[in-house]
Amino acid sequence: MSWIERILNKSTTTPSRKASIPEGVWTKCDSCGQVLYRAELERNLEVCPKCDHHMRMHGRARLHSVLDEGSLIELGSELEPKDVLKFRDSKKYKDRLSAAQKDTSETDALIVMKGTLHGMPVVAAAFEFSFMGGSMGSVVGARFVRAVEQALADNCPMMCFSASGGARMQEALMSLMQMAKTSAALAKMQERGLPYISVLTDPTMGGVSASFAMLGDLNIAEPKALIGFAGPRVIEQTVREKLPPGFQRSEFLIEKGAIDMIVRRPVMRFKLASVLAKMMNLPAPQEDIVTEAAVEPQNPEA
């Protein structure tokens, strides 16, 4: 074999097959950019173990992480959205709904369940932000009212985890009506003397923040959650001024007295149970054993 044949044989040798990694095994933190093992991140409730950044969490997973295992019963799942107005922007509303339902496996942006929290009966609602930005339409409002009615029937407290861009524009006035509808329902909770706790997660904006999300007997926020009516960019363009750092974030709002406390997600379940037990004059719950990954200290010189 000549020298040129040896070179050609080496260049045409089939490379060894590399082990393929299934899609979705790894993910990257939105804040620090650290590559994270997906299963470990899920065990840590979507909180980055390196920088403690609270990533967005699916509504159904959130309810399962808070309520007692085996106690959950879904409410209002039979309610489904309809394109009554035959609305169309760049795409038909019914097509947007179909796409969102296919992508999320949910029928709308709010999931309601009743169950127990450390043995206490409770009704809980959580937004699915992946469903059209967690926007509030007729079904979201109807399910929220169903949650209130169930809490009244069971004489138990209610809590809601908000993650929404606001009212759903494709339902026009019908979506705006839900602001008054949900607020009126909560007035019945107040008359009965039953606690309603609102947990604001990233983001809670628009018509949701202007209605039931800020009407809690206790308004709790997750760290660095964006909370407000209009977004920072819209405000800057309107007032033509640069907004202060951290504007509309949880830490900014608690300084101004707009919310009551900031609670990290790994201890949220126990904090909610403790507060509700006190509000309902029940014995204090036993503290959960939290097995979260330790947050690595940040290098100040980095």
UniProtKB/Swiss-Prot annotation:
GO molecular function annotations of the record? acetyl-CoA carboxylase activity; ATP binding; carboxyl- or carbamoyltransferase activity; zinc ion binding
Q: Which reaction does it catalyse?
A: N(6)-carboxybiotinyl-L-lysyl-[protein] + acetyl-CoA = N(6)-biotinyl-L-lysyl-[protein] + malonyl-CoA
CoA carboxyltransferase N-terminal domain residues are 25-294
Q: Which Gene3D superfamilies match?
A: 2-enoyl-CoA Hydratase, Chain A, domain 1
- Which pathway is this protein assigned to? Lipid metabolism; malonyl-CoA biosynthesis; malonyl-CoA from acetyl-CoA: step 1/1
Obligatory cofactor(s): Zn(2+)
Task: Print the keywords alphabetically.
Answer: ATP-binding, Cytoplasm, Fatty acid biosynthesis, Fatty acid metabolism, Lipid biosynthesis, Lipid metabolism, Metal-binding, Nucleotide-binding, Transferase, Zinc, Zinc-finger
Q: What is its main location?
A: cytoplasm
Q: Where in the cell is it found?
A: Cytoplasm
Q: Where are the zinc fingers (C4-type)?
A: 29-51
> Could you give the subunit structure recorded for this chain?
Acetyl-CoA carboxylase is a heterohexamer composed of biotin carboxyl carrier protein (AccB), biotin carboxylase (AccC) and two subunits each of ACCase subunit alpha (AccA) and ACCase subunit beta (AccD).
Q: What is the protein named?
A: Acetyl-coenzyme A carboxylase carboxyl transferase subunit beta
